[in-house]
Design a protein with these regions (language model features):
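Flexible, surface-exposed loop/linker segments and immediately adjacent secondary-structure boundaries
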Residues: 1-102, 185
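Proline-enriched interdomain boundary motifs that mark the N-terminal boundary
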Residues: 86-96, 178-188, 272-280
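Short coil/turn motif common to extracellular beta-sandwich-like domains
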Residues: 99-107, 192-199, 281-289
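Conserved aromatic anchor
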Residues: 106-114, 198-208, 288-296
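Extracellular low-complexity, O-glycosylation-prone stalks/linkers
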Residues: 116-132, 208-226, 298-314
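Short beta-strand segments within Ig-like beta-sandwich modules, predominantly Fibronectin type-III
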Residues: 132-138, 226-232, 314-320
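Beta-strand-rich modules
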Residues: 149-161, 240-256, 329-345
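Extracellular fibronectin type III
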Residues: 162-175, 255-270, 345-361
Length: 366
C-alpha cells in the first residue's frame, strides 16, 4: 500500500503464512482478525489499529516491531523506531445527531469532543462506497456538502496524539433537502407591526410549482393559526389572530408533488392597537388634561390640532408618560388630539383614534 488507509477483515482460511499488508515503512501481518492500516502521506508513518484478533506491526526489514492485541493501536515511522501499542480511544457520542437533515449542507455538532475526529460518510452500511472522508478538529462542527437526497451512513472515530484511530460510532441518517424552500423576505425575524392583516413576502424558487405557508403561535408549530397550500405567487396576506408573538415558514412543492422541507421559521410580533385617549378641559378651566394607556418604557408622541387631518398642529411633544397637561388654548372652538407610542427599539406604533375636544369661550375676558 503506497498511500491512504485500508480496513481489513481477514477470515481464517487454511494458510500457513499470515496475510500481510505492506507499506514503505511497515509490514502488518495477521491471521483471522479485523484491523486498519493507514500510511500517513506527510510523515510517512504507518499506523495500525486492531479491532479483533491480533496483528504484528514491524519495519520492512523486520528489525523492530510489536504485536498489537485487540483494542490497541501502534505506529511506526520512517526512522523505524520501535512501536509502542496504545489503547484505542472510545467511540464518539453521536446520540444527539439528528436522524433527518433538511438542508443541503449537513452539519453535525460535536460539542463535547476534545480530540480530533475522523468522519466518513458512505452510501452503504458496510462503508464500501465512501463519498466523504474528513478530519474535524476538537470543537468544530462536521460539515458535509454535495450529498443527494437519500439515506446515508456516517461513522466517526477519535484520533490520539499519534494519529491512532479509536473505535467507530456509526449512525444512519436521511437527507431530504430538496426542493429547497424559497427565501423568506418579510416579515423579517424580530419584526413588529400593529394588529391587522399581515403581508408575507418571499423570493421565488424556480424548482417549485407552488408554495406552502404556515403561521403558528409557537416556535415548534404545534399551534398553527393559518396555513395555505398551492400558492403560486410571491406574497400572501392573512389575518393571523390577536396581539402576540407568531412564527411563519414556507416550503416548496414540485410539479410532480414532491414536497420539500420548510424554511427556518421567522418570528414576528403583532402589537395591540392604541386605546382611545380620554380627557378634555381640566377642572380649573385653565388647562387641557389628556390621558391614555401606555407602557412606562415607551415614548409618547402627542399632537393637538385645529383640524381632523392634523395639518394645523398647534402643539406637539414627546413625553415619558401616557398623560399630557397643557395650557388652555387661547382660541375657543374644536380641537383634535391623537398620540402614538415609540418603543425603545425604535418601533413606531400607529396613531390612536382622534379625540375631539371642545374649548368653550372664556367669558372672563369679554
Amino acid at each position: 500500500m503506497l498511500r491512504g488507509s485500508a480496513e481489513v477483515l481477514a477470515a481464517r482460511p487454511r494458510r500457513t503464512q499470515p496475510l500481510e499488508v505492506t507499506t514503505p515503512t511497515a509490514v502488518v501481518g495477521v491471521r483471522g482478525t479485523q484491523y486498519r492500516v493507514t500510511l500517513d502521506g506527510d510523515s510517512g508513518a504507518t499506523r495500525s489499529e486492531v479491532l479483533e484478533g491480533k496483528v504484528k506491526l514491524e519495519s520492512p526489514q523486520r528489525s523492530v516491531g510489536t504485536d498489537i492485541a485487540a483494542g490497541f493501536g501502534a505506529a511506526i515511522d520512517a526512522a523505524a523506531r520501535a512501536p509502542v501499542p496504545a489503547k484505542l480511544l472510545p467511540a464518539p457520542d453521536l446520540a444527539a445527531m439528528p436522524e433527518r437533515f433538511e438542508r443541503p449542507l449537513v452539519r453535525v455538532a460535536l460539542p463535547t469532543e476534545k480530540d480530533t475526529v475522523r468522519v466518513q460518510v458512505a452510501q452503504d452500511a458496510e462503508f464500501e462506497r465512501i463519498v466523504n472522508d474528513q478530519k474535524v478538529t476538537a470543537g468544530s462542527d462536521v460539515r458535509i456538502a454535495g450529498l443527494d437526497d437519500a439515506k446515508w451512513f456516517l461513522r466517526a472515530r477519535r484520533l490520539d496524539g499519534q494519529g491512532i484511530e479509536g473505535y467507530d460510532a456509526t449512525r444512519a441518517f436521511v437527507l431530504k433537502a430538496r426542493p429547497e424552500p424559497p427565501a423568506t423576505n418579510t416579515p423579517r425575524s424580530g419584526a413588529k407591526q400593529s394588529l391587522g392583516p399581515v403581508e408575507f413576502n418571499w423570493s421565488p424558487n424556480l424548482e417549485a410549482k407552488s408554495v406552502r405557508l404556515q403561521v403558528a403561535s409557537d416556535a415548534a408549530f404545534t399551534q398553527i393559526v393559518a396555513a395555505r397550500e398551492g400558492l403560486t405567487g410571491t406574497r400572501e396576506t392573512l389575518e393571523v389572530g390577536g396581539p402576540g408573538t407568531y412564527h411563519w415558514r414556507i416550503a416548496s412543492t414540485k410539479a410532480d408533488g414532491d414536497k420539500g422541507p420548510f424554511s427556518d421559521a421567522q418570528r414576528f410580533e403583532l402589537r395591540p392597537l392604541p386605546e382611545p385617549p380620554k380627557g378634555g378641559m381640566g377642572e380649573d378651566g385653565k388647562s387641557l388634561t389628556l390621558a391614555w394607556s401606555g407602557r412606562a418604557e415607551d415614548t409618547q408622541h402627542v399632537e393637538l390640532a385645529r383640524d381632523p387631518a392634523f395639518k394645523e398642529i398647534v402643539a406637539q411633544a414627546d413625553l415619558n408618560a401616557p398623560e399630557w397637561t397643557l395650557p388652555r388654548p387661547s382660541s375657543s372652538g374644536t380641537y383634535f388630539f391623537r398620540y402614538r407610542s415609540i418603543e425603545p427599539d425604535g418601533f413606531v406604533g400607529p396613531y390612536s383614534a382622534t379625540l375631539v375636544i371642545e374649548v368653550p369661550r372664556d367669558w372672563r375676558y369679554l
